[in-house]
Every structure is written in structure tokens, then in C-alpha cells.
Amino acid sequence: MKNITILGATGSIGTQTLDVIRREKEELKLVAISANKSYKKVIEIIKEFKPKYAVLMEENAFKIVEDFCIDNKIDTKVLKGMEGMIYISTLEEVNTVVTSVVGMIGLVPTIKAIESGKDIALANKETLVVAGELVISKAKEHNVNILPVDSEHGAIFQCLRGNKKEEVKNIIVTASGGPFRGKKKEELIDVKPEHALKHPKWNMGRKISIDSATLMNKGLEVIEAHFLFGVDYENIKVVVHPQSIVHSMVEYKDGSVIAQMATPDMKLPIQYALNYPNRKESQIEPLDFYKISNLTFEKPDMDTFLPLKLAYEAGKKGGVMPAILNGANEVAVDLFLKGKIEFLQIGDLLQECMNKFYKSMEATLENVISVDKEVREYLGKKYDI
């Protein structure tokens, strides 16, 4: 039996993780959850799974859930804030922590979980983007597995198994292309949030949907792949594959390419990470090769989708630059969703902050938190938020 903590249990990945646990009750047990403020969903999770702990970040939501548990004589202990997230990430009885919260908020609990010897099922891209070197070194120090939950890195992880790192020529990360695949810059001038939120293949949260539309999501995945697999940026390629059947590939020095293919369903990489190193029966629809008419691959347009280009630049620059990129992007996406900036301004703001805030500093926990705060405060004042 594996005991699981889910950070971000009410979001897209968290909800699908619950689906996997629901199907595998004999092997997986939910011990603790966290959420921001979705108290209704948290109450439903508590009623069904009866976790020992539930953490709410927002004060009012915390009080509502706490009162519910007291009134209904439910044993779930309700905690709040970052202190609560760290607590449930370091519980002695927990084997694996699923980090599916969005943004920088996942960084400290993930590091604390690693230091406590927990395997990490990682769906929070920002953790590796801003502090990849630190996270990977701590994972090695504490003999912890970092198991990627997203479809691309989960695919790469599987394609690398049983092979030697020195035999790898290129890692090829596939991208659906998002809702604006094939569009040119001039066609994206009047894009509104409702257009950008309509992803052609995946049902995701609002922030990651916008990142997919700008291709920043793929840029973050490139940086993540660099740290996860120790491959230089020159050897990490992005290929647009609109069918989303091939989830990523590894090209070897002898010319062989190993690809991981499956019906697009996030439950598969989640299930793989939670059951690693074993494989379990899955409920997802199997591929029918007689029905797959064609698989196409295209080069990404980095001039139109500037954030992808900037992610490569930030990764190669190293140090705190990825943290600057990430902090600026989190704020820029929020500004776009609130109608305060245009779609194409997201890339412009990333470029502005990278130019303004870069310092030649090591990406220590203190440094990345500090520069992230600077970026957020600057953009907050600029746009009065």
C-alpha cells in the first residue's frame, strides 16, 4: 500500500489523481490533500476518501471546512496555509507526494518533501524551472525518485529506461500547438482569454491553458527536461504534433528513435508515476492503429510564439533567469486573464523582465524567492494590481 499526499487536489491533475486512487484502492491510499479555496470540492473529497489531513490556503475556506468536519464529527484534521502544506508533505507515513499546485507556491513544500525522503510525483513545472539544480541535487542526496506526471516527461522517462545517458543524441518534446497552431503574429492581435482557453486536445486549468496557447508551457517543459534528464538545451527539440498521440521521443546516437504513444489522457502518466516501477491495468481507451489515419510533425514558430524562444534563452543563461521568466509569466498570464494586457504582450513582458532583473546569481532557494518577489512587485506596481 502506498500512502499519498496530493498538493492541489481540486485542480485538473489533482482530480484525475483522485480518479486513479479511486480505481486502485487496494494499492493506493489518500492520506492528505491541499487546496487553495475550493472548499466545496474539498468537502466532497473528505466525505469520499476520509483523508487524515486537509489543508486550505484561504482563510474563509479553511474555516468552512473546519466547521464542516467538527459539525459532522469527521476525524480529518484541517490545517491552513504554507505551514499546513509543508506539514502534509513531510508526514512520516506518506510514501509519495503529488505536487499538482500551480506556480511557485509548490517549491518549498516539494523541497521539504524531498528532504523527508518522499518520492515526488511532479506535475508542478515551476518547481524544476526555478530551482531545478537544487531540487535534483537534493533528490540524489536523499535517494528520492522524481517521477514526472505530465505526459511529455513521463514519456521521455519511459523512453530512456534501460538505456545509457551517453547514448542519447536528442530528446524530442512534442507539442499539440495549442489553439493557435499555424497562426501568425498579426492574426493574434485581438485574441481574448476565452479564445486562448479553448485547448484542442487537453482539459486543463486556466493558467496552463494560456501557457499552452503561448507555447510557454512547452518552454517550461524544455527547462524541466534539461534538469530531469541532464541533457543540454541544444539537444532538446520541440516538435508540434497536433494529434497528441506521440507524447515525446528520444533519439539515440545510432539513429534509432524510441517514442511513447498513447491515447491522450492524463490519467496514464499519473498512474505510471504512482505505481512506479510497476505498470497496472489502465481504463484509458487503447490506441487503434487502424483508425489513426496520419501523424504529422511540424517545426514550432518561435517568432510568433515568443515565450518558447525566451524559455530556451532563460534556460541557457541559467542561474536565476528561469525564475525571472517564470515569475513574469505567472503575473502576465493573470493580467491577460483579467483583461489588463493583450495576448501578445505576455511575451513582451517576459522579455522586459528578463532584461531588467537578470543578475549573475546561483539559483539557491533564497535567491530564486527573492528575484521572484522583485519581478512580481515590479509588475504589480506597473499594472496597479
Curated annotation (Swiss-Prot):
UniProt: Mn(2+) binding residues: D150, E152, E221
Alphabetized InterPro entries for the sequence: DXP_reductoisomerase, DXP_reductoisomerase_C, DXP_reductoisomerase_N, DXPR_C, DXPR_C_sf, NAD(P)-bd_dom_sf
Protein name: 1-deoxy-D-xylulose 5-phosphate reductoisomerase
Cofactor(s) for this UniProt protein: Mg(2+); Mn(2+)
Superkingdom in the source lineage: Bacteria
Function: Catalyzes the NADPH-dependent rearrangement and reduction of 1-deoxy-D-xylulose-5-phosphate (DXP) to 2-C-methyl-D-erythritol 4-phosphate (MEP).
Binding of 1-deoxy-D-xylulose 5-phosphate, residues: K125, S151, E152, S176, H199, S212, N217, K218, E221
NCBIfam families: Dxr (TIGR00243), PRK12464.1 (NF009114)
Binding positions for NADPH per the UniProt entry: T10, G11, S12, I13, K37, N124, E126, G205
EC number(s) from the headed UniProt entry: 1.1.1.267
Biological process according to GO: isopentenyl diphosphate biosynthetic process, methylerythritol 4-phosphate pathway involved in terpenoid biosynthetic process
Pathway named in the protein's UniProt entry: Isoprenoid biosynthesis; isopentenyl diphosphate biosynthesis via DXP pathway; isopentenyl diphosphate from 1-deoxy-D-xylulose 5-phosphate: step 1/6
Family named by the database record: Belongs to the DXR family.
Source organism (scientific name): Clostridium botulinum (strain Kyoto / Type A2)
Catalytic activity line of the entry: 2-C-methyl-D-erythritol 4-phosphate + NADP(+) = 1-deoxy-D-xylulose 5-phosphate + NADPH + H(+)
First-tier enzyme category under EC: oxidoreductase
Alphabetic keyword roster: Isoprene biosynthesis, Manganese, Metal-binding, NADP, Oxidoreductase
A molecular-function term among this protein's GO annotations: NADPH binding
